[in-house]
UniProtKB/Swiss-Prot annotation:
It comes from the Bacteria. GO terms for cellular component: cytosol. Belongs to the NusB family. The gene is nusB. Keywords: RNA-binding, Transcription, Transcription antitermination, Transcription regulation. Involved in transcription antitermination. Required for transcription of ribosomal RNA (rRNA) genes. Binds specifically to the boxA antiterminator sequence of the ribosomal RNA (rrn) operons. This is Transcription antitermination protein NusB. Gene3D superfamilies: NusB-like (1.10.940.10). NCBIfam families: nusB.
Amino acid sequence: MPAEAKKPAPKAGRSRRKSRELVLKGIYLGLMNQKDTSVIIRELADDPDFDRADYEYFRQLLEGVAESIDELDARLAGLLDRQVSELSPIEHAILCIAAYELIHDVTIPYRVAINEGVELAKLYGGTDGHKYVNGVLDKIAAEARPDEFQRGRR
């Protein structure tokens, strides 16, 4: 962790949801301004929610999504009804975060990853954007975790 970034409060009370919200802000900054993750982490350390987030999860998710953005975009491209470049930057970031969790973090149940993406879209996305996000994430879950997805559909 860079020396300039402050560390959040002890683990009690820290939230993965707040971590995902911060990652959304970070990925958005990265997509819009081509900023490095270390710069993004330093900037987000001043966010009022930073102390309420699970720092380790935030850092891991931010770095994982940033490093995998090309892979995630390629995966999304085959499932969208438009070009990835035509997505709003917010919905693009949300889809990348949830897709990363679905593809790379099997410790998170697929329904949780989808629900968290939908909740971010409700908070930060456009009108009815959450419905679009839900549909795309459902397709990713079916591809990335077919057994878990089928069990969940029964």
